[in-house]
Swiss-Prot record:
It is found in: Endoplasmic reticulum membrane. It comes from the Eukaryota. This is Dolichyl-diphosphooligosaccharide--protein glycosyltransferase subunit 1B. It comes from Oryza sativa subsp. japonica. Belongs to the OST1 family. The gene is OST1B. Residues 28-439 are lumenal.
């Protein structure tokens, strides 16, 4: 009895293993099995405090694989933490007729790659057919990825930073050939990791070419170099946009700014700073450039003390540039707060859609150039009586509504609040806020003002005709 039972169990296990093998063999190939990277070129720009990476991928789908509707990108956990934006385009056409079609990029729902790497999906406009070859251009920006070393410097020291990455492309696909270029702001490169073949020409280090890299390959490298660009970090940025249908858009921007580079140690000598500008405080910054909308008016720049006169405005019909100077130069770890305000002509920014709704068209992001915004808030205050507000922004963010009150308001003004963290210059794109508005509400405040004046005169007349004298009883 026992031998027959053992034989039955063995036969059952054999059938289960055979079924599992058939299931695995008939299942569609995984993405890393069906797509391969023919060539990859990675260019890393370290000339500013923001790390900018340009990636060119030439991909081929396997001849026996089904159509691929997406391409996966892999990022390390550290890169995901500091990732500000990812954009991708696909090259279509040949030579002079070649165009680059923007593609949607989002975090993938697939399981993470080895070592905690996170996958992002590039959604292709048209599926990649079997044996088809295509080229993708990818751009992404990393903030707070440069580590000052030494962490503290004196007024006369240059600023040195570390940058960590991989000599080979981290990818879920098999990479046949690849090369990486790292560009620094100057020729002063203290050291860099060598992974043969590695070469250096001036301010650029080249890694590769490397051939036949397996999926999820990673070779850590470290670059130590001089970067004296101002590490301007806006810890908190709040923009308030107030719309008046009487002809004006008033904008108020509040900044909490800090120098995010190597911490300043020792005393500060203004005499040395002014007499030796090429040596003293080379990594500090004493002015900033803000790119404002065209045709701005009534511009002011002030801090908690009062107006700051050290600013210069250049404005025309195409752009406006405001150069501002804080009351003191900013060194590593130093902070300052200030406010910029200006007005805009209503007819240039408020429009009416085909369905009768009104919408304001503005630029998202921070107007200060080459800055990182840790926490950004935009408040669009709609005219009193506005209903059905809707914000259209080309990327994910937090949105909610609140009510604001101003002079002569009765029910308050609907305010659309937009919040986003880790904002860079590539986020400075147009966005719209749609709303419905009954023109009768434009008469509310004038009627209240007229009524108040009328009641005041009635009270004055009544007072003049009142007999307040004390008569004899």
């Amino acid at each position: 009895m026992a031998p027959s039972l053992s034989t039955a169990v063995s036969s059952l296990l054999l059938l289960l293993l055979l079924a599992a093998a058939i299931s695995v063999s008939s299942s569609p190939p995984m993405p890393e099995d069906s797509i391969r990277v023919i060539s990859a070129e990675k260019r890393i720009d370290l000339t500013s405090p923001i790390v900018k990476v340009f990636l060119t991928l030439k991909l081929e789908n396997d001849a026996t694989a089904p159509e691929a509707s997406q391409v996966l990108l892999a990022f390390t956990p550290t890169e995901v933490e500091h990732l500000a934006i990812v954009k991708a385009t696909r090259a279509e056409g040949k030579r002079k007729k070649k165009i680059y079609v923007p593609l949607s990029v989002k975090a993938s729902d697939l399981a993470a790659a080895p070592n905690g790497a996170r996958l992002y999906s590039i959604l292709l406009s048209t599926p990649l057919k079997p044996a088809e070859v295509t080229t993708l251009e990818v751009f992404y920006a990393l903030t707070h990825s440069l580590e000052p070393f030494p962490a503290e410097i004196t007024q006369s020291d240059p600023q040195l930073v570390y940058y960590r990455d991989s000599a080979v492309l981290l990818s879920p696909y098999h990479v046949l050939e690849q090369v990486t270029y790292i560009k620094m702001p100057s020729n002063r490169v203290e050291s860099f990791t060598r992974v043969d073949p590695t070469s250096r020409a001036g301010n650029e280090v080249k890694y590769g070419a490397y051939n036949n890299q397996l999926p999820n390959s990673y070779v850590p490298i470290l670059v130590h170099y001089e970067n004296n660009r101002p590490f301007a970090v806006v810890e908190e940025f709040v923009r308030k946009v107030e719309i008046s249908h009487w002809g004006n858009v008033q904008i108020t921007e509040q900044y909490k700014l800090k120098h995010g580079g190597a911490q300043h140690k020792g005393v500060f000598s203004r005499l040395e700073y002014q007499s030796r500008p090429s040596i003293s405080g080379v990594s500090s910054f004493k002015n900033l450039l803000a790119r404002l909308p065209p045709r701005v008016h009534s511009v002011y720049y002030r801090d908690e003390i009062g107006n700051i006169s050290s600013s210069h405005l250049r404005s025309d019909s195409h752009k406006s540039e405001l150069e501002i100077e804080p009351r003191y130069p900013l060194f590593g770890g130093w902070h300052c707060t200030f406010t910029i305000g200006y007005g805009l002509p209503l007819q240039d920014f408020l429009f009416e859609s085909d369905d009768g709704r009104r919408y304001i068209n503005l630029t998202f992001g921070c107007p200060l150039l080459d800055t990182v915004v840790d926490d950004l808030t935009i408040k669009v205050v709609l005219p009193e009586g506005s209903t059905s507000p809707q914000a259209v922004v080309p990327f994910l963010m937090e949105q909610y509504l609140e009510t604001s009150y101003s002079y002569l308001d009765v029910v308050g003004r609907t305010t659309v609040v937009l919040k986003k963290r880790n904002v860079v210059g590539e986020h400075n794109v147009p966005f719209q806020v749609y709303y419905e508005f009954n023109p009768i509400f434009m008469l509310a405040e004038p009627l209240m003002l007229i009524s108040a004046v009328f009641l005041f005169f009635v009270a004055c007349i009544a007072y003049l005709h009142m007999d307040l004298s004390i008569g004899k009883s």
